[in-house]
Amino acid sequence: MSQMTYKRVLLKLSGESLAGRQLTGIDPDTVAVLCNELSSVIELGLQIALVIGGGNIFRGLSASAKGMDRSSADYMGMLATVLNALAIQDTLEKKGHPTRVLSAIAMQEVCEPYVRRRAMRHLEKGRVIICAAGTGNPYFTTDTAAALRCMELKCDALIKATRVDGVYDKDPLKFDDAEMFKHLTYEETLRRHIKIMDSTAITLAQENNIPIIVCNMFNGSIKRAILGQNPGTTVEGE
């Protein structure tokens, strides 16, 4: 077997990835397929933390643009991430992988509160952890939450799994001639406003020298990224 490049990673998933063809809500069949991908990664023996968005259920920024109070909209979006986290937890545990959901907003009846030292201990014991409810604060995206948890938990890399194979010069779902970047620097990504993650998340990764790997969430790409095979786009320093 190939040697793992990373021992502990944070995996960022979009909420839309759980919706499947229905585009909204949680599709159990899609969740099952996604968890099969995650299972193959977990079985490598590395420590894995997940951050999942909530856009399949509610998008705070979109609601704010239509007149809803921004803080209220963002809190609703955070609650949506908890629903997604519980769906992933249930499916992973049915596959035999002990999983803990840790929420930045206290709701002890359904999940644990996010406490950094507790999260680290779960990882050390071989449990998958899912960090839910973003940062617990409005005005911060789940991309920023992913970068923050990545630093706090001392992960070796931040992997963003998407519906496409990496980062392109234009939307590959709309343009057949779109070209994929294999490598980008943090500076280039910020300067060219390449929409990998929001600028706060990229800056956090840059300041802490954490590579960001963007790859497809299916077809074994996450596993190949762990093994250092660079299946998508890697963003790092010079």
Swiss-Prot record:
Inhibited by UTP. It catalyses: UMP + ATP = UDP + ADP. Pathway: Pyrimidine metabolism; CTP biosynthesis via de novo pathway; UDP from UMP (UMPK route): step 1/1. It comes from the Bacteria. GO terms for biological process: 'de novo' CTP biosynthetic process; UDP biosynthetic process. It is found in: Cytoplasm. Gene3D superfamilies: Acetylglutamate kinase-like. The keyword Transferase applies. Keywords: ATP-binding, Cytoplasm, Kinase, Nucleotide-binding, Pyrimidine biosynthesis, Transferase. Pfam families: AA_kinase (PF00696). UMP binds at residues 54, 74, 135-142. GO terms for cellular component: cytoplasm. SUPFAM superfamilies: Carbamate kinase-like. ATP binds at residues 12-15, 55, 59, 162, 168, 171. Its EC number is 2.7.4.22. Homohexamer. Catalyzes the reversible phosphorylation of UMP to UDP. NCBIfam families: pyrH_bact. Belongs to the UMP kinase family. This is Uridylate kinase. It comes from Lawsonia intracellularis (strain PHE/MN1-00). The lineage of its organism: Bacteria, Pseudomonadati, Thermodesulfobacteriota, Desulfovibrionia, Desulfovibrionales. The gene is pyrH.
